[in-house]
């Protein structure tokens, strides 16, 4: 092998260098400056001649668009010149081929350069210190600049010379027998420590007896490792299934039995519950897009199907604590595969996410309630890093895979208990929560049982030494105290591009309907291959023989133990008939997804791993296992997965000392409010929503953001099941961990109350159809905690029974504690309730943003308070004053909640509610303030009525004679609704007749940031401030976090925009229906939706084209490269959005290379560009492609030619998702020309969307020739470069271009994701929409393209 190195000192922006400089200065104040340089390491076969063509291709791929001169060099530009400078280089570990390398190699191999084996990048840093300062050792800065798990320091001695394999460690011992027969239990104890198996005394006794007495032989290290994973708490849930003895009394039911029994009191609409990777319920009949072929290019069609609705949720806490970004990416990926792994295959639609971390200690933003002396485990990331990087990881994975994140929660908590200062409550071990919605064909609900002769196949990425022992590591009762290397080995790394390919394979199989070759499917998670392959053959204890040489290895040094136990990601295992092998291989080849047929079902009840290839003949494979042959794993399934004895847990209740909340005398309301608003749980979550795609897939009817300025306030999330249906899935979340510190039982009831209070504002089928996932994160095996969790679970099941709803799934994480020094810190016991329910019509909903003032209507506010109480225990107010309180809110009147839910649903269906929001974190005052923020509206609230009617006030405010504080900040179950004054009496009467307490709060008045929020108690004024002042206080913590994760200039610009923003003004067509009129054609108009690997937006594009009467064909780049399709066959060529090759080497670079550098494809595209009867459309990634191949702008399409137009990184230096306002100027486009002067909202979701041009003359030329087709505009419709109105910094707001003849159109925004009105997150009251209008004005552009094709035929 040979490695060539290329250096680029221009690869990093000034903003990136500034960000690194800030981090280094926090570590060492003597740092003056930092320069960065990228090094590309290209490894290729020594037998292959290094061609000039390969060199030129590499230069073209890595060269920055529009860069002047040649920045790439064979020699490094940065050199250390003295003792005050430090030069260090950080790159990937040699034995870990990164996803970046995988994508690079794919690009080269698709272009015929099969000799390229690997391509990695390292970063060189030249750090300069102040005069007189001596540079420290490089090791000091490595943790700040690199990822310990995947990267290492490169030095002269530690740099790959000719191959990344040359410095691999010597092959580790493959596996061996453990001498249990000779040494007894002591041998198990020793291997338990060496391998980090997390065996407790019970396990050690059990496995000693199994091997020494039952089997009479020594176990192998692979077998013991397998048992540790397969039978860990993480996998087996021993605690939830165990016998509970509390204070000497055995409880009649286990935790899991109590939970499962909730199903007896609800509608029986579950189709899957407690028995698969996800849960499911009866869904809807609808039409969906199905391809005519999944192995070749062809037309897609609409097909009627019945879909079940899927939900799943899990956490990924320990990996996220150790490595936040990687832990969150793989947590997201694992949950996605849980959706894929339901029945015979499921399809993900959208995700939810949640984060619970310790005290943040944001630099320069000190909070009085955050203790300053807290320490953290050396192997854990600090809370601030966890919150930023974990949310980055989950967002990045979803963005690249193509799953929007549309709901969630965030909490930062770390306090010394007010009642006992020695008790520290903090999320030292954090929570990373991931939930997901999806659908599954109703005919695919049941996995088929394994039968002799069937094949076991692995679909997805190759085997890596990652996630080794994660199931056991996650089951250790107290983390942070063990071997650091074992902690890091247990963490995985994610590859969203591979997950996308894997998902396409599963979906393709489902598209075959009854011919689906997948008989059963499971996702690979804890326990790796050993667990997932056994799961496939567990039914009936069928058994299988597995051949280790059939697995694709990503690391040549993988041992048998690692192959069997590593939890490497992006991998599913399937069961199929032998005669379906060829079909599956064809599907995977077309989708470029690896597949390995690794085993065969034997029917003998054993699972055997053989270290050899599989025989070609099926009968030989069935009989391949020779019992005299030594193998690393050979056990009967009954010993590993059979019913094992229940474990008994002897628990004791411990009384928690509680102390009454003590608020300062003379407390000012605005001071208390400002503190409360600064809490992560209460304030804006914009730092989360800005960076995550919330619209990809085109099925989103409600995501987090609402109102004119898209404030992240939504109470629920909502998706449709298809682009051709208004039926959908609603979901909401309830979690109240701080109340659980005081009263776990009350906390459980309040979790359900919050979840339903969030769900109430979308019209669902009925309450008894609601099902819940219950996720428990608790240090349950530590003293007192198990009993507390039991009490919470018992109360949870009671309230679910009372409400006639049920749990149908969930997960537990019972090792929520960490060792800090000699102290064990328990994370607050946390329950997350996620509801999901059928929604017959997603258009029947309301959001929190006030509507009246913006519409010029007079409206009033009603408070639905179910308990007639105002208690402050466990509240945001208590946390803001570094306390917990004593008397916590509770829901004792569940019957009233049921009635209130039913009444509100009825009023919603009758159109009598304008807006609604639940009272939760922060209490009533925050609730109404958020409604005002969402609607850019003022309000005038009078507390006279609630103060007169409420019965139970928190004792802390009684002492101060300040009952209004309890009314305003108590987090009792309830919600606030906005109603028209003309409907007020009817609405109040409806609630009162049902016995639901409701209090009149006041009126809305004033529109815009200058409006005022006025709060009174009779004639006594409590608060009177401009909305803009309170809005900025609500946004402040999010702003501080934004500065740490994006370009600080952009963060500041957005924060300061709250001084001048107003509701955006739209201008629609005079007659939408007339504009949507389609011409008649005697022949079909055929268009190709062309997708490269990593594209994720083709289905929403297909839906728009199908509505426009096109004959839509699904065509992959593989089809073009193999010659099974040609672009000459189509009248339209469509390039959808996504992340082709995960944006490796730059957005659309790899995609463009496959066109420009392929001698067969380039002439096809050049000919298509010249034809006068065809058109093309590229959106987002497709837009980036069109600039590179010369379809728009004045770029040439010759090989290697630099474009004159390029899409560069957003000014914010990160991915941006926004509902932006855009204007269509006068333009030549055949699609947008008729829409000139329209001003509309449109989804934007990209990381590299900033248009750049060769020079100013080109911009002037494009504008004068009317080739600019779309511009970002401000709130009054003028083109803007101001962030965030312009989300990427494009000059003059340019967001789209067309060719000089108007036939080729490239847009960065996503009109295909808002072509239906239900997809719009905000519609101004002045924007007239017919009640029967389902299509939005954006559909016009697709219809225009069809009409142009028909006209050009005539």
Swiss-Prot record:
SMART domains: GATase_5. Gene3D superfamilies: 3.40.50.880, Phosphoribosylformylglycinamidine synthase, linker domain (1.10.8.750), PurM-like C-terminal domain (3.90.650.10), PurM-like, N-terminal domain (3.30.1330.10). Residues 1087-1337 form the Glutamine amidotransferase type-1 domain. Its EC number is 6.3.5.3. Mg(2+) binds at residues 715, 754, 758, 918. GO terms for molecular function: ATP binding; metal ion binding; phosphoribosylformylglycinamidine synthase activity. GO terms for biological process: 'de novo' IMP biosynthetic process; purine nucleobase biosynthetic process; purine nucleotide biosynthetic process. The keyword Coiled coil does not apply. Pfam families: AIRS, AIRS_C, FGAR-AT_linker, FGAR-AT_N, FGAR-AT_PurM_N-like, GATase_5. The active site is at residues 1180, 1310, 1312. InterPro entries: Class_I_gatase-like, FGAR-AT_N, FGAR-AT_PurM_N-like, PurL_large, PurL_linker, PurM-like_C_dom, PurM-like_C_sf, PurM-like_N. It catalyses: N(2)-formyl-N(1)-(5-phospho-beta-D-ribosyl)glycinamide + L-glutamine + ATP + H2O = 2-formamido-N(1)-(5-O-phospho-beta-D-ribosyl)acetamidine + L-glutamate + ADP + phosphate + H(+). In the N-terminal section; belongs to the FGAMS family. This is Phosphoribosylformylglycinamidine synthase. It comes from Drosophila melanogaster.
């Amino acid at each position: 092998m040979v490695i060539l190195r290329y250096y680029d000192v221009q690869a990093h922006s000034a903003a990136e260098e500034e960000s690194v400089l800030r981090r280094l200065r926090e570590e060492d104040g003597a740092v003056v400056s930092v320069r960065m340089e990228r090094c590309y390491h290209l490894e290729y076969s020594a037998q292959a001649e290094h061609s000039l063509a390969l060199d030129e291709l590499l230069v073209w791929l890595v060269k920055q668009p529009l860069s002047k001169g040649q920045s790439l060099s064979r020699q490094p530009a940065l050199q250390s010149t003295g003792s005050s400078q430090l030069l260090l280089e950080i790159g990937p570990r040699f034995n870990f081929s990164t996803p970046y390398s995988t994508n690079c190699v794919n690009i080269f191999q698709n272009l015929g350069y099969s000799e390229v084996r690997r391509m990695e990048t390292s970063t060189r840093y030249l750090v300069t210190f102040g005069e007189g300062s001596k540079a420290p050792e490089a090791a000091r800065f490595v943790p700040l600049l690199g990822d310990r798990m995947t990267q290492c320091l490169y030095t002269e001695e530690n740099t790959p010379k000719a191959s990344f394999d040359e410095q691999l460690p010597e092959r580790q011992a493959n596996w061996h027998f453990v001498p249990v027969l000779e040494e007894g239990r002591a041998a198990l104890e020793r291997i338990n420590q060496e391998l980090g198996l997390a065996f407790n005394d019970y396990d050690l006794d059990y496995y000693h007896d199994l091997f020494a007495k039952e089997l009479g032989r020594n176990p192998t290290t692979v077998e013991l490792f397998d048992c540790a994973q397969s039978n860990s708490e993480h996998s087996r849930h021993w605690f939830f299934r165990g016998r509970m003895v509390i204070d000497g009394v055995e409880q009649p039911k286990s935790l899991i039995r109590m939970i499962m029994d909730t199903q007896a009191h609800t509608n029986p609409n579950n189709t899957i519950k407690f028995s698969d990777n996800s849960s499911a319920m009866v869904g809807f009949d609808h039409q969906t897009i199905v391809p005519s072929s999944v192995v070749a290019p062809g037309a897609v069609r609409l097909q009627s199907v019945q879909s079940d609705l899927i939900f799943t949720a899990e956490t990924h806490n320990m990996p996220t604590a150790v490595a936040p970004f990687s832990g969150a990416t793989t947590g997201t990926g694992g949950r996605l595969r849980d959706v894929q792994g339901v029945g015979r295959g499921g399809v993900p639609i959208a995700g939810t996410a949640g984060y619970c971390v310790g005290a943040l200690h944001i630099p320069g933003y000190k909070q009085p309630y955050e203790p300053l002396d807290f320490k953290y485990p050396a192997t854990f990331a600090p809370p601030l890093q966890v919150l930023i990087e974990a949310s980055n990881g989950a967002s990045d994975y979803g963005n690249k895979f193509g799953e929007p994140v549309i709901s969630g929660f965030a909490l930062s908590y770390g306090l010394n208990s007010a009642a006992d200062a020695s008790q520290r409550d903090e999320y030292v071990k954090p929570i990373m929560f991931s939930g997901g919605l999806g659908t599954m064909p109703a005919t695919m609900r049941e996995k088929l049982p394994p039968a002799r002769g069937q094949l076991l196949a692995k679909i997805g990425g190759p085997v890596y030494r990652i996630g080794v022992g994660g199931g056991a590591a996650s089951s250790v009762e107290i983390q942070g105290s063990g071997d650091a290397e074992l902690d890091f080995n247990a963490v995985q790394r994610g590859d969203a591009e591979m997950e996308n390919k894997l998902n396409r394979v599963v979906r393709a199989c489902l598209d075959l309907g009854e011919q689906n070759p997948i008989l059963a499917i499971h996702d690979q998670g804890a326990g790796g291959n050993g667990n997932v392959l056994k799961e496939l053959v567990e039914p009936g204890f069928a058994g299988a023989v597995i051949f280790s040489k059939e697995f694709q290895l990503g690391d040549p040094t993988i041992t048998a133990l690692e192959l069997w136990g590593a939890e490497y990601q992006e991998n599913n295992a399937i069961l199929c008939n032998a005669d379906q092998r060829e079909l599956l291989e064809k599907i995977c080849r077309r989708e470029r997804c690896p597949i390995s047929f690794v085993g065969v079902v034997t029917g003998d009840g054993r699972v055997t791993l053989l270290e050899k290839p599989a025989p070609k003949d099926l009968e030989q494979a069935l009989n391949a296992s020779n019992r005299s042959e030594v193998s690393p794993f050979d056990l009967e399934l009954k010993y590993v997965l059979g019913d094992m004895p229940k474990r008994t847990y002897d628990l004791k209740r411990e009384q928690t000392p509680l102390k009454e909340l003590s608020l300062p005398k003379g407390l000012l309301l605005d001071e208390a409010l400002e503190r409360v608003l600064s809490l992560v749980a209460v304030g804006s979550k914009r730092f989360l929503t800005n960076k995550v795609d919330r619209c990809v897939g085109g099925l989103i009817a409600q995501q987090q953001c609402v109102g004119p300025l898209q404030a992240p306030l939504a109470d629920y999330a909502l998706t449709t099941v298809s682009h051709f249906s208004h039926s959908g899935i609603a979901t909401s979340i309830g979690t109240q961990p701080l109340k659980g510190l005081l009263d776990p039982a009350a906390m459980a009831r309040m979790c359900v109350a919050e979840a339903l209070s969030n769900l109430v504002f979308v019209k669902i089928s009925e309450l008894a159809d609601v099902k819940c996932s219950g996720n428990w994160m608790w240090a349950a095996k530590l003293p007192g905690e198990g009993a507390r969790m039991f009490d919470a679970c018992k109360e949870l099941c009671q309230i679910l029974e009372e409400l006639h709803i049920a749990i149908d799934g969930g997960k537990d994480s019972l090792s929520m504690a960490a060792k800090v020094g000699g102290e064990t810190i328990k994370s607050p016991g946390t329950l997350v309730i996620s509801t999901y329910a059928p929604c017959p019509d997603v258009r029947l909903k309301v959001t929190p943003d006030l509507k009246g003032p913006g519409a010029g209507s007079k409206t009033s506010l009603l408070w639905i308070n179910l308990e007639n109480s105002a208690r402050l225990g466990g509240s945001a107010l208590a946390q803001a004053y570094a306390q917990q309180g004593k008397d916590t809110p509770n829901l004792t009147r569940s019957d009233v909640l049921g009635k209130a839910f039913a009444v509100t649903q009825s009023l919603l269906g009758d159109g009598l509610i304008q807006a609604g929001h639940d009272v939760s974190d922060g209490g009533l005052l925050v609730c109404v303030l958020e409604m005002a923020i969402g609607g850019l509206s003022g309000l005038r609230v009078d507390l006279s009525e609630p103060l007169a009617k409420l019965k139970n006030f928190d004792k802390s405010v009684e002492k101060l004679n300040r009952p209004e504080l309890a009314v305003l900040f108590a987090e009792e179950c309830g919600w606030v609704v906005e109603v028209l004054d003309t409907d007020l009496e009817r609405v109040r009467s409806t609630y009162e007749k049902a016995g639901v307490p409701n209090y009149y709060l006041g009126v809305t008045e004033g529109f815009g940031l200058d409006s005022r929020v006025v709060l009174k108690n009779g004639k006594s004024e409590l608060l009177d401030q401009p909305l803009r002042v309170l809005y900025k206080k609500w946004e402040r913590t999010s702003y501080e976090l934004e500065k740490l994760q994006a370009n600080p200039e952009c963060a500041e610009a957005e924060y300061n925009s709250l001084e001048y923003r107003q509701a955006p003004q739209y201008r629609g067509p005079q007659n939408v229906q007339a504009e949507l009129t389609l011409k008649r054609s005697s022949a079909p108009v055929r268009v190709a939706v062309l997708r490269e690997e990593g594209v994720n937006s083709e289905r929403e594009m297909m839906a728009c084209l199908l509505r426009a009467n096109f004959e839509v064909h699904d065509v992959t780049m593989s089809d073009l490269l193999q010659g099974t399709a040609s672009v000459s066959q189509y009248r339209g060529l469509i390039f959808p959005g996504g992340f082709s090759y995960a944006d490796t080497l730059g957005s659309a670079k790899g995609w463009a290379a496959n066109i420009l550098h392929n001698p067969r494809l380039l002439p096809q595209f050049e000919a298509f560009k010249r034809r006068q009867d065809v058109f093309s459309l590229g959106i987002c990634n497709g837009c980036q492609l069109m600039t590179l191949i010369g379809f728009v702008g004045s770029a040439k399409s010759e090989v290697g030619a630099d474009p004159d137009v390029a899409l560069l990184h957003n000014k914010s230096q990160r991915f941006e998702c926004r509902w932006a306002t855009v204007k269509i100027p006068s333009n030549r486009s055949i699609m947008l020309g008729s829409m000139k002067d329209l001003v509309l909202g449109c989804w934007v979701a990209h990381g590299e969307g900033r248009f750049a041009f060769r020079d100013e003359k080109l911009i002037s030329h494009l504008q004068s020739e009317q080739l600019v087709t779309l511009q970002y505009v401000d709130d009054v419709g003028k083109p803007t470069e101001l962030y965030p109105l312009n989300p990427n910094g494009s000059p003059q707001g340019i967001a789209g271009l067309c060719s000089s003849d108007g036939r080729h159109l490239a847009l960065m925004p996503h009109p295909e994701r808002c072509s239906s009105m239900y997809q719009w997150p905000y519609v101004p009251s002045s924007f007239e929409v017919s009640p029967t209008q389902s299509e939005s004005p954006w559909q016009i552009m697709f219809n225009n393209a069809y009409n142009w094709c028909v006209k050009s035929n005539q």
